[in-house]
Amino acid sequence: MKDTVMVYLLENSIKFNGKPNPKAVMGKILGGNPDLRNRVNELNEVISKVLKEIEVMSLEEQQIKLNEIAPEGLVQKTERKRKEIELKNAKDKVVMRFAPNPSGPLHIGHARASVLNDFFAKKYNGKLILRLEDTDAKRVLPEAYEMIEEDLKWLGIKVDEVIIQSERLEIYYGYGRKLIEMSYAYVCDCNPEEFKELREKGIPCKCRETTPETNLKLWEKMLAGELDNVAVRLKTDIGHKNPSIRDFPIFRIEKTPHPKNGTKYHVYPLMNLSVTIDDHLMGMTHVLRGKDHIINTEKQEYIYKYFGWESPEYIHYGILKIEGPVLSTSKMHTGILSGEYSGWDDARLGTLRALKKRGIKPEALYKLMVEIGIKQADVKFAWENLNAANKEIIDKDAKRFFFVDSPKKVIITGFKNKKINLRMHPDRSDFGNRELLFDGEIYVSDDLEAGKMYRLMELFNIVVEKIENGVIYAHYDSDDISVARTNKANIIHWIPIKDSVKVTVIDENAEKIEGFAEKDFLITEEDDFVQFERFGFVRIDEKLDDGYICYYTHK
């Protein structure tokens, strides 16, 4: 078992420039050796022991060791072939829709619906409609109309048509009138609490038996703005086992000025009416929605039945449980207005804009949402899977640099100046090398202890003599890494003070991490990705006169 673990750990460490990831290695070992699944505890112990051996090796020593124990080459990566998701009863030219409320920009939850609808529209040579459902004026953020289209463009989603519901009120009025004429709907002026009490008991209210002629007159008064506190209700089954389905409302009075319509209209449709009308008129073949909409689907089926229309194929998928960032649009908006958040792309938020700012590539998010698919079971959003997919995309182009956060000054005596050359990328010789000049004064991140030996990565061993006024004093001890191994010396990153570049990294909690990078970091540009060794990947956001602002992406 030890030899197997050694090969996997060395492969992983060499791939990532001397920094093995034991969790990733555990997964690969179990994936390639199913017989070890009942020996996980034992495997964990072996990984821990082998990890200690590898961590004191230089990258060159790791490569030599791997060639000794696995001369046939590195362990080959194997991936399970995923079965591509299908749509039930799908034919060519499907018509799909993504229908958000423009209350803010899109967040991770929206990404699932938008990606899946786009995926199936492309798969079946169909059409994708963006429908902005803005019939509740209280929930509309004017700038969200444009933001949503920008977010979809970033995701790589091209819609064929954009529909705005607030521009279609006259259409909804026409179908509302027809329902009243057919005696399938009525104007109700009952007190909401009294109606609720009757509904719970399965008792029709007094308005239910009003004639269509009278209801049409009341309807005209509603449209003219002459009535308050009334609603239009759809006649369903007053004895339905689910009280919420009993005579649910389809129109309401709304006096709040609308961002697009102002005060021109006073009557607005509720979601179950407007959605049904639009899905029919737009020829929707399939509707993807969360299983929390199952009751809405049943409500909408009444409208399809009353008009004699064929309903689309409904697919209800499980809830996507997302832990971590803020997803509530109202909380985000309130926080932005109060100054708690810097904007819609604040690193603590779950918006697509925040993911973009942090360095998540749209291709990675798209891929993950397709993999999550349309399963009926609830799914926990796995950040590690998103990060892994993102890493596959950015790793090949991310130059490597040393970065020292919370820097401590170290003065080292007993050794003359020395230049070292390191690869910009372990697999990209075309990136060239980077140069570090040791001149006796460096920054380190680690808290060093007097009397202990440490190995400066790719350099030599030092012994700390004393720490005074926050400055660490040490002397050169030896070059040989075996000496460091014998003394169980930690290997630490370092940055020459003279050539250091100031860097501020903003993490996923919007906390600022101050530090320094090596001088060759100056070759980078805004929006580049780099990997700070033993720290993680970052996206360069801003190049300032006195340094850089970067956003932490992931390990």
From Swiss-Prot:
InterPro entries: aa-tRNA-synth_I_CS, Gln/Glu-tRNA_Ligase, Glu-tRNA-synth_arc/euk, Glu/Gln-tRNA-synth, Glu/Gln-tRNA-synth_Ib_cat-dom, Glu/Gln-tRNA-synth_Ib_codon-bd, Rbsml_bL25/Gln-tRNA_synth_N, Ribosomal_bL25/Gln-tRNA_synth
Free-text function comment from the UniProt entry: Catalyzes the attachment of glutamate to tRNA(Glu) in a two-step reaction: glutamate is first activated by ATP to form Glu-AMP and then transferred to the acceptor end of tRNA(Glu).
Gene3D superfamilies reported for this sequence: 2.40.240.100, HUPs (3.40.50.620), Ribosomal Protein L25, Chain P (2.40.240.10)
The protein, known as: Glutamate--tRNA ligase
GO CC field: cytosol; protein-containing complex
GO biological process, one term: amide biosynthetic process
Motif ('HIGH' region): 100-110
Cellular compartment(s): Cytoplasm
A Pfam family reported for this protein in Swiss-Prot or TrEMBL: tRNA-synt_1c_C2
One MF term in the entry's GO annotations: ATP binding
Catalytic activity from the UniProt record: tRNA(Glu) + L-glutamate + ATP = L-glutamyl-tRNA(Glu) + AMP + diphosphate
Keyword annotations of the record: Aminoacyl-tRNA synthetase, ATP-binding, Cytoplasm, Ligase, Nucleotide-binding, Protein biosynthesis
Assigned protein family: Belongs to the class-I aminoacyl-tRNA synthetase family. Glutamate--tRNA ligase type 2 subfamily.
E.C. number(s) listed in UniProt: 6.1.1.17
Organism lineage string: Archaea, Methanobacteriati, Methanobacteriota, Methanomada group, Methanococci
